[in-house]
Amino acid sequence: MFVGIREITSARGRFGLIAGTVALITLLVVVLTGLTAGLGKQNTSALEALDPQSVVFQDPEDISFTTSRVEARDGLTPLGASQMLMTKGNGEDAAVAILSLPKGTELPGGQQLSDEAVAAPSLEVGEGETVTVAGNDITVGAIGEDLAFSHSPVLWVPTDFWKEVMHTDADGTVLLSDHEVDGGVPLKESFSGLPAYSSEQGSLKLIQGFLYAIAALVIVAFLTVWTMQRTRDLAIL
């Protein structure tokens, strides 16, 4: 300990350099961890707010929110999900995630879905404003929670409107259940069906792993070199 304290006081610059390097690497890891979590929420916050226990896709072997289409079943809630372009009342276009549920369903913000849409605040539309999606008009009846799906703000709409927009007879993209059902997958596993979610999260976590390894190598290399330089002092002790 005496040698270590002496080295710190006599080689402040060297010690400060390695301490600063470790601090910067730590900061980078923290920032990247926050970025990974933030991007994940931008993909999944709407689904997490619904908080189903099971998600049923058209094909259990092909988990995809893009291609799945399902019919309504007793005890299960159909959820439609699509990425669309929305035109606001002032003519401005905005990318939006259209999520549909049956009328009367309670949304994460506490609103009850009716014939009117419920918009995320980040869409910057007002209550009573009429918006257009794929040539179909709908009035925004309320502003809900600021949720996102696949990196787009959410516009909650009734199932009938989603079917018109998508030109489909299907009742939704997936079925949601508050209990385990045959053919369903847990909510966390369903995230792999989001476009680019798995690759995005995998890449960021791989970078985090490399940063941890680099930080460990830098610290070990520094301590090894420093110890070897003081071998004689340690031998005397």
PLM regions and their residue ranges:
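N-terminal membrane-targeting/anchoring modules of bacterial envelope and secretion proteins
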Residues: 1, 5, 33-34, 59
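Feature of multi-pass inner-membrane transport and sensor proteins
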Residues: 1-16, 230-233
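Alpha-helical transmembrane segments
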Residues: 9, 14, 27-54
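Hydrophobic alpha-helical membrane-associated segments
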Residues: 24-35, 215-223
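Basic-flanked hydrophobic alpha-helices used for secretion and membrane insertion
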Residues: 84-201
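Peri-transmembrane interface segments
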Residues: 181-217, 224-232, 236-237
